[in-house]
Amino acid sequence: MEIKRKKIRESALFPREDDCLIQEKLDFEIRMRDGICKLLSVSSQKEQLLNAVKNLMVCNARIQNYTAQLRSQMGESNTGNTGRRSSDVGLNERQACPGKVAISGIRIPLMWKDSDHFSNKEKTQRHSVFCMLRLGPEIHDTDMVIVDKTMTDICFDNVTVFADARSDFQLKLELYSCCMEDSSIANTPKKLARKLRNSIGKSAGKKFNSELEATEPEAFLFSTPHMPGARYSLLAQITFTLDSIEDNFRTHSLTITGHEDSSFWLPLYGSMCCRLVAQPACLTDEAMMGFLNQQEMVGGLRSYTKFYCVLKGGNLLCYYTPEEINAKVEPALTVPINKETRIRAVGKDSKSRASSFSVINVVSGEAVTKVFSADCKEELQKWMEAFWQHFYDLSQWKHCSEKLMKINETSPQKPPLFLTREPASVYHDMSIGSPMKLESITDIIHNKIEETDGQFLIGPQEESAPAPWAALFDGNHQLHVERNKPPLLSSDDPSTSSNVKAKKRRAPPPPPNKTPFSKLVEGNDPSDKENIWSRASLVRKSFDTKLSAIMHQLQRPMVVPLTPAPPEKIEVTENKAELDTGTQEPIKPVPTPRQKSLREKLDPRVWLQSQV
């Protein structure tokens, strides 16, 4: 008896936890309203004033909503104390699990006249527009959008999420509009008070000023239900239900409440496009967890495997240990629990002394049965209650419980510069057959930059084909060159320059039946300097010929490279090469005849010798 008195005393003197939460929210909104009122008194720009008035409307709507909740809860508590007993109330009545409802991508098309849409853009009339969303005790708003005659549709990029929605929810969307070209929009309450003080007499003005400073500013602000100057009016509205949810963009019909002659009027098309999704808690939260024993028949013998089972996301996930869940290990067994699943209690087993139940699923037209057993009857009752609640949640959320829909809860307020774009026309998104959202060019370029790690901006780098002589330097080939003639000595080497000058002599004239062989030798003859361009072309040709010969040798079977012989043994190597080749005698090069000087050419004795 003392316990009952204590409970009654606590319920009467101390408020419930829900009441405290609502009271805290109410106090917060009141403080927000006070701050907005102070901001309104100093606002001078149109957009600042309109944004402040919008926030003030949302605060007032939330205050009214929280006040109504407190009154209703107080009324329920009073009727509960004086009315019928709690045992008379149906405690066994089931309620579907809550869920999340999110709306995003709101686009409302406009239907301008051709004369209005293509008229002078500088003198066009602008409107401030925003949406207020109501679902149960929650109220949210979108960003304020400035609309003029150049826009084809109104776009709101906000993602609004309602975290505690019931299956029979009603989401109400209200579209408010205000004309920005109204001359009275800049008349804030402070300016209006100054004009009123100046319009009356001097003595009366001082008296009015003292009374205005003595009273609180919010008392003056809320003397009328609407703020003077800037005033939003309801332009259109729509109510969404569970049947309106679809995991894609969908077109809905609007109810237009404004009149064409109103200053806040906008030529709405009569429809809107948005993405409305829902996530029931039965697909995201863990409904039940605990140990179960799976029963199997192996070779006519009954065996049991102990699992730690979790009922989540429409599946019964079976793990060996609870630690596997935190380690994100794949479950050892997954049993679907959907609308087509049948669960039956098997009864108490005398051998195992445990209660069992069977889970029956139809796979490819055949019934697949899994038998589980609990440790005690109380555990079995908890599992059966969780299964019945899960089936009830699936039936109440209908098509939303078949597949988990994705909610993008993060929406950047100020996206990066390369992601900003002007809103496209809503007609690209409003498709009856397969509605889809088109991707802009900036999004494609941004994705390409991320995929190629910035190489997309530089451009494709064309890899040129390697030169034929590039294989000489890759280090994968062994080169063996047999030299049949002594190497040409460079005049740049100081050690060999003296020997070259000492051994330099005139070459004998070529035989009459042999063609002359051109051989480039560096020297200081002035005649060589005159033929420098012709020799450069010969050098290029000879270099290409050598490269082709070397590449041809690389294609043959590789031989072990030999160390080059010293210059004294070159002649011996040449003789051995002639003996090995046999009949194939190499053609010896013929030196080029020495060019005659001008004095020798003009000598008459040389003419006589040539005639002989």
From Swiss-Prot:
Record InterPro entries: AHD, Cytokinesis/Rho-signaling, HR1_rho-bd, PH-like_dom_sf, PH_domain
Annotated Low complexity bias: 486-498
One of the GO biological process terms: signal transduction
PH domain segment(s): 285-392
REM-1 domain ranges (all copies): 3-79
Region (Disordered): 483-530, 574-612
Domain of life: Eukaryota
Name assigned to this protein: Rhotekin-2
Annotated organism of origin: Xenopus laevis
